């Protein structure tokens, strides 16, 4: 069985299901686990990823005015690989190559089938793993993953059950300029992690939030995890972040805690590491209750001191 993944989260799902040996091609953004980075790359971006967050945002908007997708698909390479299945998504044209591009390419690959993922909520992510496992003939692996999901989610819930009714207000930031806050599955994650959701609605795309609306929120916890940004990229935009959010107003009224998290690895990829992301969020929301997660994921997160300064 020959598999192509055009989405980082899909690649992680296939690896979790024990199918890494079947992978013959991936997208240009598939970087985990490291062993997939040597596989042929089937996509490239038309936007300029070297710009700051405002520049990337504007570059993507400009590309989408004039093109079907932000990404190019190497159709000739895809044909030469002769995959049996292509795993992609049809939810977000900014996240990966468009579904219509994949469909068009598959018309010339008569024996190739498309598995399309479309997660909006946590349950959709788990269902995508299960349905992919069943389609690819590894259903027990999918069931094994579902058991892991149930156990790890319940472990967080159980510890919170003995904690009382304290639920800090949690704001997650998905992009810095303009400010997007986490939507889709993030509100559910905040709820499970023992927090109150600020503004976002479960199952809905990440909304742009004005500074005026941010001033009204007064969050207890702010988790900054820009989509596709590793920690070093987010750190470069820390000064920009300070101009985008009313952090001084928040700090004057309450002791808001700020965290920077690797947004390339966590939260934004709807795959197996969403479980890791939930545990990170549990630590950020209740650090005294979940101290071990702070240690476990220390390489992927930074707790900022007051004044949004590095420790």
Predicted regions and their residues:
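N-terminal ligand-binding lobe of clamshell/alpha-beta domains
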Residues: 1-311
């Amino acid at each position: 069985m020959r598999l192509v993944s055009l989405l980082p989260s899909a690649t992680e799902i296939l690896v979790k299901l024990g199918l890494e040996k079947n992978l013959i091609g991936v997208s240009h953004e598939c970087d985990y686990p490291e062993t997939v980075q040597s596989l042929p790359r089937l996509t490239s971006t038309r936007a300029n990823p070297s710009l700051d967050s405002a520049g990337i945002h504007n570059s993507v908007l400009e590309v989408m005015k004039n093109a079907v997708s932000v990404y190019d698909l190497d159709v000739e390479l895809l044909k030469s690989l002769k995959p049996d299945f292509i795993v992609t998504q049809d939810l977000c044209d900014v996240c990966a190559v468009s579904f219509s591009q994949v469909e068009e390419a598959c018309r010339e690959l008569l024996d190739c089938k498309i598995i399309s993922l479309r997660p909006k909520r946590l349950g959709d992510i788990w269902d995508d793993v299960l349905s992919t496992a069943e389609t690819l003939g590894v259903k027990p692996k999918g069931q094994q993953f579902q058991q892991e999901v149930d156990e790890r989610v319940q472990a967080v819930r159980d510890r919170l059950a003995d904690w009382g009714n304290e639920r800090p207000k949690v704001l997650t930031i998905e992009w810095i300029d303009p400010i997007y806050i986490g939507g889709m599955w993030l509100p559910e994650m905040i709820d499970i992690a023992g927090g109150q959701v600020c503004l976002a609605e479960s199952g809905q795309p990440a909304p742009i939030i004005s500074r005026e609306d941010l001033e009204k929120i007064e969050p207890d916890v702010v988790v900054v995890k820009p989509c596709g940004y590793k920690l070093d990229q987010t750190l470069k935009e820390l000064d920009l972040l300070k101009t985008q959010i009313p952090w001084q107003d928040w700090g004057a009224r309450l002791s808001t805690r700020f965290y920077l998290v690797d947004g390339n690895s966590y939260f934004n990829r709807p795959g197996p590491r969403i479980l890791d992301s939930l545990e990170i969020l549990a630590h950020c929301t209740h650090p005294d209750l979940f101290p071990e997660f702070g240690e476990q994921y220390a390489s992927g997160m930074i707790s900022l001191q007051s004044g949004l300064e590095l420790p």
